[in-house]
Amino acid sequence: MQPNEQPGTGPADTTLEQQDTAAAEVGHPRRIRSFVRRAGRTSTGQQRAIDELGPRFLLPYAAAPLDWEAAFGRTGARRIFEIGFGMGETSAHIAQLRPDDDFLGVEVHEPGVGALLKLIGERGIGNVRIVSHDAVEVLAQMIPEGTLDGIHVFFPDPWHKKRHNKRRLIQGPFVARLAAHLRPGGYLHCATDWEEYAHQMLEVLSAEPLLENTADGFAPRPDYRPVTKFEKRGLRLGHGVWDVVFRKRAA
């Protein structure tokens, strides 16, 4: 999800609320979700990219560990997992900047998948693979614990209404899962343009015993994360953006 892009209040959100309510009524815990289904039409160019580049860069979801070396065609690269890459501009930029790292992006929004594939084709990027599925399930089923060198969670849905805060992705139980999947020394980088959510992120990550902050509070924006057009617009309007970067403690 991109900065300043907020979840809607249409049928998809109503369905989520109904599902959560029904689950609570029968005694089931609320399920963590990594996404909000958004409306949007896949453009001709995006669909062409999916058709032409999907066979190489799109990986099927499977309830089995991913063979990274087979998927990326090389060994020894650092493994970076990205949750929700929006329209893919940031992912493409970072992948180009860090050609020695392999990036697995997870996004359910088809126009976003097509947009990133289009950028991959235009820029000749070879170190990105995509799974179009719920990132929570991808992490649980396809990524063994202790195997990731980095995790990116940029501008997740802020769920700005107080009654919806419980739906936010960055909460204690999920951060514990993320930390478990990092190697010792691996990093977790989150960013948001919603100040209250930023403070929650900092608090939740600080409370995770497997993680340590790389900064004294919020981190300076790392050079590899570009300033998006949405972010530039927000900064011109006086809005802030906050980064938190934590590292997994040595075993």
UniProtKB/Swiss-Prot annotation:
Q: Where is this region: Interaction with RNA?
A: 163-168
- Where are the stretches annotated Disordered? 1-43
Q: Give the pathway.
A: tRNA modification; N(7)-methylguanine-tRNA biosynthesis
Question: What PROSITE patterns does this protein's entry cite?
Answer: SAM_MT_TRMB
Cite the record's Basic residues compositional bias ranges. 29-40
Provide the disulphide bond pattern.
Answer: none
List the Pfam families hit by this protein, alphabetically. Methyltransf_4
GO cellular component annotations of the record: tRNA methyltransferase complex
Which EC number applies? 2.1.1.33
Residues annotated as binding S-adenosyl-L-methionine are E82, E107, D134, D157
Task: State the InterPro entries in the record.
Answer: SAM-dependent_MTases_sf (IPR029063), tRNA_(Gua-N-7)_MeTrfase_Trmb (IPR003358), tRNA_methyltr_TrmB_bact (IPR055361)
- State the Gene Ontology terms under molecular function: tRNA (guanine(46)-N7)-methyltransferase activity
Reaction it catalyzes: guanosine(46) in tRNA + S-adenosyl-L-methionine = N(7)-methylguanosine(46) in tRNA + S-adenosyl-L-homocysteine
**Matching SUPFAM superfamilies:** S-adenosyl-L-methionine-dependent methyltransferases (SSF53335)
**What broad class of enzyme is this?**
transferase
So where's the catalytic machinery, residue-wise?
A: D157
Chain sites annotated for binding substrate: K161, D193, T228, K229, F230, E231
Q: What UniProt keywords apply to this chain's record, in alphabetical order?
A: Methyltransferase, S-adenosyl-L-methionine, Transferase, tRNA processing
Describe the function of this protein: Catalyzes the formation of N(7)-methylguanine at position 46 (m7G46) in tRNA.
Q: Which PANTHER family match?
A: 3-DEOXY-D-MANNO-OCTULOSONIC-ACID TRANSFERASE/TRNA GUANINE-N 7 - -METHYLTRANSFERASE (PTHR23417), PENTACOTRIPEPTIDE-REPEAT REGION OF PRORP DOMAIN-CONTAINING PROTEIN (PTHR23417:SF14)
What is the protein's given name? tRNA (guanine-N(7)-)-methyltransferase
Q: Give the organism the record lists.
A: Ralstonia nicotianae (strain ATCC BAA-1114 / GMI1000)
Gene name for this UniProt entry? trmB
